[in-house]
């Protein structure tokens, strides 16, 4: 009787695990479709949302892919035609560099600072390189200032988690990104 109970329990656990893997695999393919659709329809808020979802899913599988994900977002920022969305992507990139630095701070701070040379792989960077890159990305996230000041934050409701006072405190994209830059630094 105990053997049957163990076998039944093992089958149930296997069924649950396989269901979880199936759901995760389906989410990934759905997410890839969302990225392709957002690119085709030039819906940059949807593209940014799909990128965020894909990055979260990828990081759940393998934390070591973080540098590659940063490069991917940099590629999207370099090819995106919408200046306001490019500013958001630069803000995301700054946050990603900051998060990577914070997660690896102990190792990074043990290295001798580099001057005049920037390794391609951020796993080899020193603290001064991270600080400079984060500052550069935050500066880019606030440009073009005039356009960002005229862009209502409501255009990006899809990707924002706002509190009830957000429209009064940060009515434009520039306000939002400026507060975000302060938080990141």
Regions found by a protein language model. Name each.
Residues 22-23, 103:
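Transmembrane helix-loop junctions and nearby membrane-interface residues
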Residues 31-185:
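Extracytoplasmic/secretory-pathway proteins
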Residues 24-29:
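Ser/Thr/Pro/Gly-rich low-complexity linker/stalk segments immediately outside membranes or between
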Residues 1-11, 23:
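N-terminal Sec-pathway targeting helices
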